[in-house]
């Protein structure tokens, strides 16, 4: 979707609020917090930095971080475990959306390896974007890199999407993207 200059400014403000939310959250994270508690911290910060959540916040630890839309539960954050955060604030009706996977203390070797693969796939996809490309073509750049690394079957979601008044707007960067 094409955004006016006013809409772009509003989206940048929502995304900046989301960045501030993450910066405020990180010092509050500690080992032993449950997914539920972490999600509630995110919700509280979404109220502080925006006008609440743009969508239901996801916080998941350990093996749960591999589930794209895991419902937070009682599992607790342990040393070196991945912590997946998927959250966004709503600010002046515009939605932000951010997914981050972090690890407290020293992340395990597999986490570091997978993080490098995903980071490189994302970098390649962004670098490949050209006028006229479809979302499907951009998604394929990342999907190809992850597949060549041996993890293609684990890539069960799209690469990304546009933002606006709704959290999921066009374009869609996925195998079905336009």
Where are these regions (language model features)?
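Active-site neighborhoods and metal-handling regions in enzymes and metal-associated proteins
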Residues: 1-178
């Amino acid at each position: 979707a094409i955004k006016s200059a006013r809409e772009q400014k509003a989206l940048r403000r929502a995304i900046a609020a989301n960045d501030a939310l993450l910066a405020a959250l990180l010092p509050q994270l500690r080992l032993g917090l449950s997914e539920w508690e972490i999600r509630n911290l995110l919700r509280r910060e979404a109220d502080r930095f925006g006008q609440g959540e743009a969508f239901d916040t996801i916080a998941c630890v350990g093996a749960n971080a591999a589930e794209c839309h895991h419902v937070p539960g009682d599992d607790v954050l342990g040393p070196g475990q991945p912590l997946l955060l998927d959250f966004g604030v709503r600010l002046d009706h515009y939605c932000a959306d951010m997914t981050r996977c972090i690890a407290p203390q020293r992340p395990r070797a597999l986490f570091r390896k997978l993080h490098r693969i995903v980071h490189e796939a994302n970098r390649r996809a962004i670098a490949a974007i050209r006028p006229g490309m479809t979302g499907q073509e951009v998604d394929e750049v990342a999907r190809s890199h992850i597949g060549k690394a041996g993890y293609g079957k684990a890539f069960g979601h799209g690469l990304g999407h546009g933002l606006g008044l709704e959290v999921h707007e066009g374009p869609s960067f996925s195998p079905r993207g336009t």
